[in-house]
Amino acid sequence: EGDLSIPWRRMLSYREVRDFSVRVRNMPRKWEGSNTAVGDAIAFSAAQFGRVSDCERKVIDMSGDGSSNAGLNAAVERRKAEAAGIEINGIAIDIIGASITAFYSRFVITSDGFVVTSRGFSDYPRSIREKLLRELIKPGS
């Protein structure tokens, strides 16, 4: 089951982005200990772009510490999103013995997307920063 925690918004100033980050940081977690339905998350996220059709880029950012064990097929939903012009990037939180990075690489990210590996939850802040910089800063050539 998907849920939109914060409604879509256009952020054009530093203050708007800062206020948004404070709100996100202080949000309670909606689910804990539930199933992992990556395909459902992709489908739910892709449907949200209908509300903001004038976006220059459509990017879904996925992060998780598990592969799918419920819901829609992640690879099928990824193909649908990609056909709709949506890029999917991810942060795979790899915990001892689990290769979530391999799952994300094979079934979640689109051909123009990428996955960043987080070595556990304590490494997540570094990983999210790396991912955001990679998405927002165009490399010089």
What is each model feature region?
Residues 1-4:
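Acidic helix-start/capping segments at beta-turn-to-alpha-helix junctions
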Residues 11-58, 90-100, 123, 127:
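Von Willebrand factor
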Residues 25-35, 64-68, 114-118:
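Second-shell loop/turn segments in exported
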Residues 45-46, 56-70, 108:
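DG-centered beta-turn motif at the end of beta-strands
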Residues 54-59, 83-89, 111-114:
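Loop/turn elements at helix/coil->beta-strand transitions in domains of secreted/extracellular proteins
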Residues 66-107:
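VWA/integrin I-like adhesion module and closely mimicked acidic/polar interface patches used
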Residues 93-140:
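Von Willebrand factor A/integrin I-like adhesion domains
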